[in-house]
Amino acid sequence: MADNDMWTIKAALDWTVGFLERKGDENPRLSAEWLMSEATGLSRIELYVNFDRPLTLDERAVLRDFVARRGKGEPLQLISGKVPFRYITVLVAPNVLIPRPETEVLVSEAFAELKLPRVADHIATGENGEEVVSPELPELRVVDLCTGSGCIACSIASEYPAAHVVALDIAPEALALAEKNVVALGLGDRVEVRGSDLLGALDHDEKGSFDLIVSNPPYVPTKVCDGLPREVSEWDPRLALDGGEDGLDLFRRFLPDALSYLKPGGVLAVELFEGHLDQAFSCACDAGFEQTRIAQDLTGRPRVLVTRKPR
């Protein structure tokens, strides 16, 4: 991509696709469009109606940097610094698990199990035109265990205005990023980030007080971790991936405490490895949970365990 050449969007896009193909990118066209969109501020559709527009020097410099990073295998989400998650956009950063679309199903299943009232029925318009939440909307107390970027905690709080979420993680990098996302999304009054080894940072007087504990813990079996694609193994922290021999090490550890911190009838929803949901089902039943079910992810694989504390 020489500086003295005229580079239109189409020419730069074609060059980027070819470069990424040679670097072994599995989806070079998708990657090229994503990078071009980030560099120009145009949507992927807008790129195609602006094929003949020349790139500015600044856009070319940004694109050149992005393409070089992608050529080294850096995930697109880290290059752009953000990722959409359900109805929000969250910041991402190195050494923190990148949110995946599959995890959106975890939030959907948790909401479905709780059978919450329609938020729209409890929203009124204030004197200055602002939205006002009715005090009749039931409060929802939530723990997001292994919060990572905070995508789950922030998503729940943004979608349900009466939710108060405690977001827990042990990794300093994750805690810092989660706090940034809470502030960026204006959720500081309803999402509290705490450093914690599993549920250890919850207070004794909080036992029996939570409606929902939701978690995307490290759940990849160790042997599977060793064979993960480079884009995952080199950029997502091992701490956020490796769940031990069968992927259930942390799940087994926090089950008893989850039972004690939930209200009677409270919900536990956990994303887990597709091959070991049956074992997780048995673990939950043995720990005293009931009404346990398994939900599939977007690809039809078993992914989420949902269960309840007895009433």
Tell where the protein language model's regions lie, with residue ranges:
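Class I S-adenosylmethionine-dependent transferase superfamily signal
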Residues: 110, 156, 232, 254-258
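Residue-level signal for inorganic ion chemistry
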Residues: 35, 73, 103, 152, ...
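Mobile active-site "lid"/loop adjacent to the S-adenosyl-L-methionine
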Residues: 219-250
